[in-house]
Amino acid sequence: MSLINIKKNISDVQAPDALLKKLSAALAASTGKSESYVMTLLDSGVPMIFAGSEEPCAYVEIKSIGALTPSAMSDQFCELIKMSLGISKDRIYIEFDDVNAANWGWNGRTFG
């Protein structure tokens, strides 16, 4: 019941599966939730402009049922994205969403 979704305007990514696994492990560790409930998405080549520029940038959504620590996680995930994709931290927006368990479905039911 945790999700990280990265949309970026650059197309080529070296070893995207390795990056998705790294993000999954990092999200599980930072939320204290089992990785068996973590989903990671990477959407490349999205038309995107940030601060009036087409330079590499990313929009990141991090959703979880509780266990979010935005100030710590913002630095952690900006650094991970910078190191993995070469996108400067000041060109990354992260939106955190603490989702009500009743609004998150899985396996034909909700968590709350």
Predicted regions and their residues:
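Interaction-mediating elements
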Residues: 1-112
